[in-house]
Swiss-Prot record:
<dbReference type="GO" id="GO:0043005">
    <property type="term" value="C:neuron projection"/>
</dbReference>
<keyword id="KW-0677">Repeat</keyword>
<feature type="repeat" description="WD 3">
    <location>
        <begin position="188"/>
        <end position="218"/>
    </location>
</feature>
<feature type="repeat" description="WD 1">
    <location>
        <begin position="105"/>
        <end position="135"/>
    </location>
</feature>
<protein>
    <recommendedName>
        <fullName>WD repeat-containing protein wdr-5.2</fullName>
    </recommendedName>
</protein>
<dbReference type="InterPro" id="IPR020472">
    <property type="entry name" value="G-protein_beta_WD-40_rep"/>
</dbReference>
<feature type="repeat" description="WD 4">
    <location>
        <begin position="230"/>
        <end position="260"/>
    </location>
</feature>
<feature type="region of interest" description="Disordered">
    <location>
        <begin position="1"/>
        <end position="31"/>
    </location>
</feature>
<dbReference type="GO" id="GO:1904115">
    <property type="term" value="C:axon cytoplasm"/>
</dbReference>
<dbReference type="GO" id="GO:0008090">
    <property type="term" value="P:retrograde axonal transport"/>
</dbReference>
<dbReference type="InterPro" id="IPR015943">
    <property type="entry name" value="WD40/YVTN_repeat-like_dom_sf"/>
</dbReference>
<feature type="compositionally biased region" description="Polar residues">
    <location>
        <begin position="63"/>
        <end position="81"/>
    </location>
</feature>
<feature type="region of interest" description="Disordered">
    <location>
        <begin position="63"/>
        <end position="83"/>
    </location>
</feature>
<dbReference type="GO" id="GO:0047496">
    <property type="term" value="P:vesicle transport along microtubule"/>
</dbReference>
<dbReference type="InterPro" id="IPR036322">
    <property type="entry name" value="WD40_repeat_dom_sf"/>
</dbReference>
<feature type="repeat" description="WD 2">
    <location>
        <begin position="146"/>
        <end position="176"/>
    </location>
</feature>
<dbReference type="GO" id="GO:0031023">
    <property type="term" value="P:microtubule organizing center organization"/>
</dbReference>
Amino acid sequence: MEQRGRASQDEEQAIVGAETGSQPSLPVSPMRPIIAPSPAMVLPTPGHGMGIPQFGPVGLPAQASTPMLSSTPGPSYSSAPTPMPNPSAANLWPTYKLVAEIPNAHKKSISGIKFSPDGRYMGSGSADCSIKIWRMDFVYEKTLMGHRLGINEFSWSSDSKLIVSCSDDKLVKVFDVSSGRCVKTLKGHTNYVFCCCFNPSGTLIASGSFDETIRIWCARNGNTIFSIPGHEDPVSSVCFNRDGAYLASGSYDGIVRIWDSTTGTCVKTLIDEEHPPITHVKFSPNGKYILASNLNNTLKLWDYQKLRVLKEYTGHENSKYCVAANFSVTGGKWIVSGSEDHKVYIWNLQTREILQTLDGHNTAVMCTDCHPGQNIIASAALEPDMRIKIWRSQS
């Protein structure tokens, strides 16, 4: 039986830890919404379930010119903090405001957005088969090409030198960020590869697929170390904890599993009574808790050692698409997520109250990421929006 009582202040400190670590967040592709979240999943054809154009071929030109930045939000960009019933919490309110916008960042829907662990760059992945790198003044730097179909996920290595990506082309690729070259292609999955990440030391790569398996690869030679038939539906998200000892996986089967990364064995299984499809999982900064995004308009914070839910965050809309959530610890201790109502939501980690909503996108917000060292949030949305928005807070 899940428990939804508030965690103590000590638990909150344990959740966020003393450092943010360098794990990349793991946004999940918006390209395949869940039509019928039931034991017999009905999954739309990739790239078609939400009425977007089919993925294009390789060869889309890299953007040679710098996209225009807009630092002045229009009248519809309301970022005032949501009124709070508890005045004593006012000093904990985030004050995010729109400070920059990259229009037409990609040619198709943006499936992921990530800051590099060193905080110097931002990456964005898209259904247009490209990953673009942006400087922190949000000026275009370069494009990484190599996949034949749309990008479902990408993640940075902890030293910010490499990017691993996965695609509907059933491949996992590793790119050298400095040169922009694909340096390794990992083959083995038999269906769309939905998620991928490096372990903190950069020695392992994990991936999850619509073939219902998790693969752990040697990052040096690209060989498969483990192929794990870990779920009964597509694997939607994978994430290492901060020391790399454990790998979490989430699936449309409604289950989160924790794996020993050295043996490939399952050490914990998390499932609640409702078991809605899981679309994203992320370890807390200290690696002791897991934040799971669910296709029933909830985020759940699990104490996976005790197999219980510590917190449940609600108020946003998420019942159709794969939307990622993040921890923000550079200012207050917050949970950040996109939403199908075109907004970004920010919750107080401890009280579960919505502190602020960020308005400005005109389609479902699939991707958010929090800068590792500054109070900055990046967000991106489905077609036809295709804009990256940058929000900054003074608190």
